[in-house]
Amino acid sequence: MSRSVLQPSQQKLAEKLTILNDRGVGMLTRLYNIKKACGDPKAKPSYLIDKNLESAVKFIVRKFPAVETRNNNQQLAQLQKEKSEILKNLALYYFTFVDVMEFKDHVCELLNTIDVCQVFLDITVNFDLTKNYLDLIVTYTTLMIMLSRIEERKAIIGLYNYSHEMTHGASDREYPRLGQMIVDYENPLKKMMEEFVPHSKSLSDALISLQMVYPRRNLSAEQWRNAQLLSLISAPSTMLNPAQSDTMPCEYLSLDTMEKWIILGFILCHGILNTDATSLNLWKLALQSSSCICLYRDEVLHFHKAAEDLFVNIRGYNKRINDIRECKENAVSHAGATHRERRKFLRSALKELATVLSDQPGLLGPKALFVFMALSFARDEIIWLLRHADNIPKKIADDFMDKHIAELIFYMEELRAHVRKYGPVMQRYYVQYLSGFDAVVLNELVQNLSVCPEDESIIMSSFVNTMTSLSVKQVEDGEVFDFRGMRLDWFRLQAYTSVSKASLSLTDHRELGKMMNTIIFHTKMVDSLVEMLVETSDLSIFCFYSRAFEKMFQQCLELPSQSRYSISFPLLCTHFMSCTHELCPEERHHIGDRSLSLCNMFLDEMAKQARNLITDICTEQCTLSDQLLPKHCAKTISQAVNKKSKKQTGKKGEPEREKPGVESMRKNRLVVTNLDKLHTALSELCFSINYAPNMVVWEHTFTPREYLTSHLEIRFTKSIVGMTMYNQVTQEIAKPSELLTSVRAYMTVLQSIENYVQIDITRVFNNVLLQQTQHLDSHGEPTITSLYTNWYLETLLRQVSNGHIAYFPAMKAFVNLPTENELTFNAEEYSDISEMRALSELLGPYGMKFLSESLMWHISSQVAELKKLVVENVEVLTQMRTSFDKPEQMAAFFKRLTSVDSVLKRMTIIGVILSFRSLAQEALKDVLSYHIPFLVSSVEDFKDHIPRETDMKVAMNVYELSSAAGLPCEIDPALVVALSSQKSETISPEEEYKIACLLMVFVAVSLPTLASNVMSQYSPAIEGHCNNIHCLAKAINQIAAALFTIHKGSIEDRLKEFLALASSSLLKIGQETDKTTTRNRESVYLLLDMIVQESPFLTMDLLESCFPYVLLRNAYHAVYKQSVTSSS
């Protein structure tokens, strides 16, 4: 097979262009990272900033590229010491520059080959060949510009080479050429303009072919709107027709890329601008569109200035310089507005497209081209804005700020999501298209070719066979398609048929090129949807504009109408890894970490914003709930009572206070309250949080809803504790009922969040409220349980001990007593049945158990002190125990007792604490009976049916269960546990038992002394005594039950003994004649009745045998009579 000396098939143009383009991007990545490292003092190679090497570095740079080591020993002495380390650490940098040089050689060789072969280049016909050719030239140009921007390049290369020479006795073999290249490309564009003179014909032909594409792509928003671009519903009759074009791949080709080709390309072959009007118009159009172009990532080129600086030194280029200045002025004044209008149009166009496709995903088949065009157009506009916002004068900054950019990105993400979700739908459509239409048309085209060499015939036959063999069943079976080989074959075929002496020339068979370009697009719809999404909508460039990225996000959150699109920012973080390259693997971790930190930060900020809105709504709702509290109706009642009298006076009364609920009355729908605004803002933001169930960023899965959940938990915890309004200095705290109202209002708002976001708010309640039933939460902070427990113990019960508050059994509450110093709180408002029920609701069984344990700890400390007093009087008490029927001896023994008042006071304190606990337990039982009636009744059955012969351990387990449910027990398990901890190793069990028995004796013989106390008078109205001695009944019974359970004694026998001693002692005061000692005798008699009434072990018959009932009856008559007299 005879061909020309340079056979196209042997030159492998397609393969070389593919490989060199990929390698060029890799080299750019490496140079970019070197430039950034050298610009960062922390990442810069230490040898460049080492003070000891400063003179050596300056010398090397000054002499570069010459190498002089002989006569400069003094300056290079320090270098001699560190040569091995320098060789080791600068090798990566040095050989990157060597790789750039080799890449340059390969590119120059390939460009020469293309020139020699006289390759025909037309973007509308041999798209892949032309695109790759232009990409290679731009990559090569960018690479050399990037190289020239690394200021430390001479120092790095020189340091490495000098170290190499000192180590090996000779320069590195690549150094001479490398050094010369660095010097030659000090001004890269100027050097390349000279270098590209021989390539001008090929390059200008390729660029001129863009005349068919670029002008019709670079239109204004108004022209787009008039053409109804990207609209599926503008022509309903053609909705199902496939979107077709003679230049399919050009339709979604990046405008940004084309502008880069045109601007850099015509700078390199500038001669044609003077001879060809088409080229000049194309170039001027591109110059007017931007102020700068992207070289790589965030590296830009201000091309107006660069071109002007190059042309100013060329004779006869005044016209071109004027053109540049004119275009620059036009770009500065009009480009911002033009692109702003485009973004505005694209927002509505993409919204329409996404909405239609979500409703009818089947349209993704025929209208796939529209989707990728929309993505490409939007991506170009976003990148343009990002690039210019960071590189424009502050005077015109307003044109480059777009508060609605998040909306455009969001619709891009929606379209991307549709393509990923409905990929199989598109596959089915295009598999049928390829086999049923494309294969047939291509076969006819091939059959009609007048000339078709063997190689080309084989390739095209394989195309037809491949497409014909496709079937829908392959899609249904989940078969993985791979048309990469077919696409590479078409690329090869373009190369074979585009050379000047080709037997089958594409210039003569343009229809074949256009048909194949369409077929290639269709194959990509089957096997390369993900790659197509990256090609048309990758926004990984945001990774390198972190400040602008974060600023856009903050603007989005601040604008309520845009906050619903804020999820687009975390979604963009999923793009970042696509900008990495295998030739620079070391940056993967850096970019991956950045994507993770940004995604985390965005989701966290969104959740915080939502949390703050929810908190504001909760605050409003708590205020509204507070208005409904009973305390606020007092003013209304007083106004109603005084209404008549105010009418009679004829004076105008006070204006009526607004009643709760008035905020819901609207005069018209235009009235918007603060609560309305908050709900609107919240619903918008929650839409965003709920949009994506999860997202994968660098193999890490993020769940936006979990961010909101965790923030709600933290804020709910803080709010509950904050709403207690506990002040440690003044000892003020919110009433439990008011806190409960606020908490319920808060929970109602949180429950409504489930209408916006699919989160498990019950889980939040369980986590937070259960933690609040413990002493400390998971962060070690105090909870409402600890705050209320401390307050009731340290404030309320302490004031009871001080005599400022009394327990009123009739009211089942603690009530303030009139004293000189008024208390800062009303005890009744914190201890009545409604407040205790509210407390039980808030603390729950666990919290109430903690409260009980804290109360018992205080009781145990009082019992410990009582035991000490018993030990002090042990001999006297032992004798009194056996002499209760000998009045004279008892009187003598009583006089020898010490600390009688202390014993009674401590027992009263114990009684007060137990009375408070009984209130708390009763409230807990009421609350649990409401919430879990069947479970409470089952526990009650357990407790009521314990056989007397049951083992005490088993009985105590049942009592513990009952106590946790708020049920009263014969023996208090919490008290037993608290007193059991007092067991001493130094005292024998027998001695402990004896002390317990004598304690009961001490209390019994001390009771008569209460009669002399003025405050011991019984009040029938409160069913108790103002000095709380009525609480002794509870204290005596429960302490006896607990102590004798611990010491395995008979509770009943010991209480009988107590009753005998107490009745004997009280009967003696009946014989007393001193009115002072017997002033409240009748009131004290009633204690015996209370003790028996309180006890499950004593009976009235037993009391009758010890103490005549007639005395009790007379005592009741006397105290009631006395109360009537005192009240009258």
Swiss-Prot record:
Look up keyword Lyase and say if it applies. Answer: no
Return the annotated region ranges for Disordered: 640-665
Q: Which GO terms describe its cellular component?
A: lamellipodium membrane; SCAR complex
Compositionally biased, Basic and acidic residues: which spans? 651-665
Q: Read off the InterPro entries from this record.
A: Nck-associated_protein-1 (IPR019137)
Q: Name one GO biological process term.
A: cortical actin cytoskeleton organization
Q: How does it sit in the membrane?
A: Single-pass membrane protein
Q: Where are the transmembrane segments?
A: 995-1015
Sorted UniProt keywords: Cell membrane, Cell projection, Membrane, Transmembrane, Transmembrane helix
- Please report which protein family the annotation says this sequence is part of: Belongs to the HEM-1/HEM-2 family.
Query: What role does this protein play?
Result: Part of the WAVE complex that regulates lamellipodia formation. The WAVE complex regulates actin filament reorganization via its interaction with the Arp2/3 complex. Actin remodeling activity is regulated by RAC1. Plays a role in neural tube closure.
Q: What is this protein called?
A: Nck-associated protein 1
- What organism does this protein naturally occur in? Xenopus laevis (African clawed frog)
The encoding gene is nckap1
